[in-house]
Amino acid sequence: MAETALHTPGKNYTFGTVLTAMVTPFKENGEVDYESAAKLATKLVDDGCDGLVVTGTTGETSTLTDEENLGMFKAVKDAVGDRCKVIAGTGTNDTAHSIQLSKRAAEIGVDGLLIVTPYYNKPSQAGIQAHFEAIASATELPVMLYDIPGRAGIAIAPETIIALSKHPKIVALKDAKADYQSTTTVLANTDLDVYSGDDGLTLPLMAAGAVGVVSVTAHVAAAKYRILVDAMLAGDLATARAAHFELDPIQRAVMSHVQGAVAAKHILNWQGVLPNTVVRLPLVAPSETELETIRTDLREGGWEI
């Protein structure tokens, strides 16, 4: 069993502690809006984020070209500089393609890589391990594994994560598995920095030893996540629990009714942060009923929408 020290505020975690899984803004004609992406990145850092995940699931990476992915990495890195960590979503279900994209991201100067479980192929656990190890060995950048079986179609077994933790470049895990026992096993047997990949599970995962969150809802509530995460790192459960409850209706608004990128773009547009709500197919705009449900949740959270 790994000897894990109590996580504390101020420690220099490789990727920070409050990370937003950024949307990719588009222009009305469907082209990537790099200027809006840079402005959004700057706002998120101003609001309390110390890490940004660029072109992950929420960034609609599966409908971006390689050049668009790379353009987003550069736009965000240029905008925030050293104010926060920029983690590039370079994982695909093609190991060779992922390696190529990761190498090009490294040339741009990103601070790390987010590598998702290879989706659709449904490899064995040995194949999953080999996939991650090959990508992690291809650059000098630190790597965050992304375990999200609901989208990938297959989970990374805790035993596989434990084996992968021995790779010198694999330092973190974005846990979107919603399997507390699996997460507990990983935390008890590795020194990985574990991040909640489910916004609403940030508090319980941090109670077990996670260091923070990679959040979609942080687009519109980064300051509140900063309070929750810092309180948990400091052992102040009362403050963290209060923030957890205050975040609940906002999390529901962003994550419960439509795909997270769709909801986040609408709320950011309502706030005047993004100029439009454009997403790429197969994502589509919410219905009026869905939009009203989102507004109802936001009003419950004290927002005037």
What feature does the model see in each segment?
Residues 37, 69, 73, 98, ...:
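A general structural signal for well-ordered alpha-helical segments in protein cores
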Residues 3-20, 24-153, 161-163:
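Active-site beta->alpha loop and helix N-cap motifs at the rims of alpha/beta catalytic domains
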Residues 78-84, 107-109, 139-141, 166-169, ...:
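Short helix-capping segments at alpha-helix termini
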Residues 27-30, 36, 68, 123-124, ...:
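Solvent-exposed, flexible loop/coil residues
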Residues 134-138, 149-248, 252-256:
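Catalytic alpha/beta core domains of metabolic enzymes, predominantly
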Residues 3-10, 14-24, 43, 47-49, ...:
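C-terminal alpha-helical cap/extension of soluble enzyme domains
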Residues 31, 57-60, 90-92, 198, ...:
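Gly/Ser/Thr-rich helix-start
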